[in-house]
């Protein structure tokens, strides 16, 4: 029987099991199965996945994110805010501004601290990737995919593809509560046009500075929030002429609000909370 200490945290209800790999050890070959086991709501702790906070050669810390199906993702906006909170509060970093390595690249985090606790985290998510090759999706490599039609159940849905280090398909609807989240979501996620699968977002524009948001996450299904998805939604809204670049947009997710801005300089900034749920020790056994 093996075990490790963990902290369960969430960003707007998007919860992960966080493991401090400066102190803990999980064999590389076990990571996918451990992520699946610990995320199980009935036989594990229950979460949207597992995130490792690791040493890095190029930043103070490195984030590795695993979905609850065991697949490894390249980035996670809500996860990054929680990693920023954990790293500062556990003295893995000293400054309130620092970098985090991800499989999608290095991002910059800035934390707001009150009485020694991080109350808010802002992440510079970098520039969005808009070509098919960068997303990635099939088709002409250098061509963006903006408001193209997808036929499902005799209804045409127009979506825009954006990568924020992970792929997103953003669909505008009149009412997110009536969107085909659990039906169209998994169909698009696994469609052959996306060789690495895709996250699917449904967006309802409220005004020039607010939107409602619902998400079907690649490898996890319906979740309360998706930080990279919120960033992709704002970028897609601007590309489609629905919102203005440079303004801070409030994205209303099922779990709460994020503030997102696609700056004139090109990067996307995400600001929101990160909270600790509990600490504990998880025991597991890998069958031979």
From Swiss-Prot:
Superkingdom field: Bacteria
GO molecular function: diaminopimelate epimerase activity
Pathway(s) served: Amino-acid biosynthesis; L-lysine biosynthesis via DAP pathway; DL-2,6-diaminopimelate from LL-2,6-diaminopimelate: step 1/1
Main location: cytoplasm
Main EC class the enzyme belongs to: isomerase
EC number: 5.1.1.7
Pfam families in alphabetical order: DAP_epimerase
Site label Could be important to modulate the pK values of the two catalytic cysteine residues, positions: 168, 217
Subcellular localization: Cytoplasm
Active site: 76 (proton donor), 226 (proton acceptor)
Matching PANTHER family: DIAMINOPIMELATE EPIMERASE, DIAMINOPIMELATE EPIMERASE, CHLOROPLASTIC
Function summary: Catalyzes the stereoinversion of LL-2,6-diaminopimelate (L,L-DAP) to meso-diaminopimelate (meso-DAP), a precursor of L-lysine and an essential component of the bacterial peptidoglycan.
Family: Belongs to the diaminopimelate epimerase family.
HAMAP family named in the record: DAP_epimerase
Protein name in UniProt: Diaminopimelate epimerase
Organism for this UniProt entry: Bacillus cereus (strain AH187)
Designated gene of the protein: dapF
């Amino acid at each position: 029987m093996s075990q490790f200490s963990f902290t369960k945290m969430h960003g707007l209800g998007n919860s992960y099991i966080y493991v401090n790999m400066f102190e803990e050890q999980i064999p590389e070959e076990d990571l996918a199965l451990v992520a699946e086991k610990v995320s199980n709501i009935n036989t594990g702790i229950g979460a949207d996945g597992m995130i490792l906070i690791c040493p890095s050669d190029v930043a103070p810390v490195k984030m590795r994110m695993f979905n609850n199906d065991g697949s490894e993702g390249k980035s996670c906006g809500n996860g990054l805010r929680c990693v920023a909170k954990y790293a500062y509060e556990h003295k893995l970093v000293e400054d309130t501004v620092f970098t985090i390595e991800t499989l999608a690249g290095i991002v910059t985090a800035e934390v707001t601290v009150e009485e020694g606790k991080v109350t808010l985290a802002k992440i510079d998510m970098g520039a969005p990737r808009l070509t098919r090759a960068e997303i990635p999706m099939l088709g002409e490599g250098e061509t963006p995919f903006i408001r193209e039609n997808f036929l499902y159940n005799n209804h045409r849905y127009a979506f825009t593809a954006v990568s924020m280090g992970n792929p997103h398909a953003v669909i505008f609807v009149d009412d997110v509560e009536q969107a085909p989240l659990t039906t169209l979501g998994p169909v698009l996620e696994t469609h052959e046009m996306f060789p690495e699968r895709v996250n699917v977002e449904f967006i309802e524009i409220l005004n020039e500075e607010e939107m409602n948001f619902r998400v079907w996450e690649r490898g996890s299904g319906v979740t309360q929030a998706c930080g990279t998805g919120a960033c992709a939604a704002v970028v897609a809204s601007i590309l489609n002429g629905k919102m203005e670049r440079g303004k801070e947009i409030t994205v209303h997710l099922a779990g709460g609000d994020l503030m997102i801005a696609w700056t004139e300089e090109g990067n996307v900034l995400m600001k929101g909370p990160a909270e600790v749920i509990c600490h504990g020790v998880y025991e597991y056994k890998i069958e031979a």
